[in-house]
């Protein structure tokens, strides 16, 4: 990639690449940076040659549009391309991007399991949920602590001699009341969630 050219006489927008200028220049090659005809000299990028990046028009997030006279965002001077590529150009406004980004990212990144709090891909969601629900809760042995043993990581208070504790199979120890509260919501050791 070459160096970025700058000119003192050209004004800058508060956000690079965002402008009210509505011009886009079609690319002469399949993927690259191109100068637009507007005052800002904005760039358009064609992603039509990138495999798997040709979604239907209804699935495109705001700011991405197909070039061509029959599209909602693609019409206008200088944006037509015989290949019908997908462009991100000066027509992509900051408001459009901020409006769609949280929903688009959330829809494509999976979900957080309410049982184990792991992030799971959306195609594995059902199987993961079944596995989490069928996993048995950890059992523990309750005991009375014979000597001071550091800190309970749930309540962050000291484990003192004489406290009623719970010892998990992984040998972690907690106040019995703390781990009982923890197991009402979770099914794993607070320090070893993957076990």
From Swiss-Prot:
Q: Which Gene3D superfamilies match?
A: Zinc/RING finger domain, C3HC4 (zinc finger) (3.30.40.10)
Return one Gene Ontology term, BP aspect: proteasome-mediated ubiquitin-dependent protein catabolic process
Q: Which reaction does it catalyse?
A: S-ubiquitinyl-[E2 ubiquitin-conjugating enzyme]-L-cysteine + [acceptor protein]-L-lysine = [E2 ubiquitin-conjugating enzyme]-L-cysteine + N(6)-ubiquitinyl-[acceptor protein]-L-lysine
Lipid attachment residues per UniProt (N-myristoyl glycine): 2
Q: Report the InterPro entries cross-referenced here.
A: Znf_RING (IPR001841), Znf_RING/FYVE/PHD (IPR013083), ZNRF_ubiq-protein_ligase (IPR051878)
The annotated regions of Polar residues compositional bias extend over: 1-10
What coarse category fits the chief subcellular location reported for this protein? Answer: other
* Mapped zinc finger ranges (RING-type): 152-193
Query: What topology does it adopt in the membrane?
Result: Peripheral membrane protein
Q: What does this protein do?
A: E3 ubiquitin-protein ligase that plays a role in neuron cells differentiation. Plays a role in the establishment and maintenance of neuronal transmission and plasticity.
The entry's free-text remark on domains says: The RING-type zinc finger domain is required for E3 ligase activity.
Protein name per UniProt: E3 ubiquitin-protein ligase ZNRF1
């Amino acid at each position: 990639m070459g160096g970025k050219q700058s000119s003192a006489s050209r004004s800058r927008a508060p956000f690079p690449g965002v402008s009210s200028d509505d011009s886009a220049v079609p690319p002469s090659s399949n993927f690259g940076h191109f100068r637009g005809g507007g005052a800002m000299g904005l760039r358009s990028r064609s992603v039509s040659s990138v495999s798997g990046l040709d979604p239907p028009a209804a699935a495109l997030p705001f700011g991405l549009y197909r070039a061509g006279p029959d599209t909602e965002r693609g019409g206008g001077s200088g944006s037509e391309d015989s290949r019908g590529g997908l462009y991100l150009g000066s027509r992509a406004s900051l408001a459009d991007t901020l409006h769609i980004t949280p929903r688009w990212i959330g829809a494509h990144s999976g979900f957080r399991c309410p049982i184990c709090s792991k992030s799971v891909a959306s195609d594995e969601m059902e199987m993961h949920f079944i596995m989490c629900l069928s996993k048995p809760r950890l059992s523990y042995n309750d005991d009375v602590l014979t000597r001071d043993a550091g800190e309970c990581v749930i309540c962050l208070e000291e484990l003192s001699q004489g406290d009623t504790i719970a010892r998990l199979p992984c040998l972690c120890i907690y106040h019995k009341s703390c781990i009982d509260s923890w197991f009402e919501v979770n099914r794993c050791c607070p320090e070893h969630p993957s076990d």
